[in-house]
Amino acid sequence: VADDRERFLGPTTIRFCPLCGGSLRRASVPPDHREQAVCRLCDFVFYLNPKVVAGTIPEQDGRVLLTRRSINPGHGLWTFPGGFVDFGESVTDAAVRETLEETGLTVDLTGLLNVYSYPGSPVIIVYRARVTGGTLTPCAENDLLEWRAPAEIPWATLAFDSTREALREWVAARGLTPGG
């Protein structure tokens, strides 16, 4: 999967400078001399940085809300509410917004669970959340929403490594042994 991301989103697929439209070349850039995309005309360095994803683990009565994805990546697999942080938006605002969009529920963030980072992937920031209102409603990105007790988490059908790691931490924080 990381190889596919590199092919479609990697530095070799960016060909033109966003400032002047000049063609980009690969060049060593100080101070660490890592190879980057550099404009042949204006010398602008185009750093391809990871995107940021904000997610929540909504909790209620000792259970966690999981969403089954109806789109790729991870079609048919389970995760928690989350999505990309929009430009100009804080990570916490994005976490609350994504939860509302994907579940119909409003939440208060109760703390940072953890930050997950994998080469070639977005940085995923996951918060614990308490439901404060709304009506449980799936969206176009998921076809099923379910409250699950720790023993009911479908470890074999989780969508992403970050989903698995975050849920393991959530379960372990309750003094239980995580599955999967």
Where are these regions (language model features)?
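A broadly conserved sequence feature marking short terminus-proximal activation segments
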Residues: V1-I14, A166-L176, G180
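N-terminal cysteine/histidine-rich coordination modules
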Residues: V1-Y47
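Conserved Nudix-box catalytic region and its N-terminal flanking loop in Nudix hydrolases
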Residues: D4-R7, E59-E101, N114
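Conserved N-terminal beta-strand and adjoining loop/helix that marks the start
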Residues: I14, G22, R40-L65, F84, ...
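A short coil-to-beta-strand element that immediately follows conserved catalytic motifs
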Residues: A27-S28, L105-L113
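Short beta-strand micro-motifs in enzyme catalytic cores
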Residues: H33-A37, V52, S121-Y127
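Conserved hydrophobic "DFG−1" position in protein kinase catalytic cores
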Residues: P58-E59, L66, A129, W147
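Active-site-adjacent beta-strand/loop module that shapes the phosphate/pyrophosphate-binding cleft
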Residues: V115-T137, E146, P150, A166, ...
